[in-house]
Swiss-Prot record:
SUPFAM superfamilies: Hypothetical protein YjbJ (SSF69047). Residues 27-59 are annotated as: Disordered. This is UPF0337 protein PP_4561. Belongs to the UPF0337 (CsbD) family. Pfam families: CsbD.
Amino acid sequence: MSGTKDKAKGLANEAIGNVKQGVGKVTDNEKLRAEGKAQELKGEAQQVKGNVKDAVKKP
């Protein structure tokens, strides 16, 4: 997978995670909030992975 795809997937996961956290907070659902936080962190990691891939590609 290219760095750009990793970054895009990361942004999507981060956004979905934020939504889950918000819904979990509004509905007082700690499990959903935790799932959202985990997905947000996954998204952040994917973005870092994409940035590293792009950095390695550049001469």
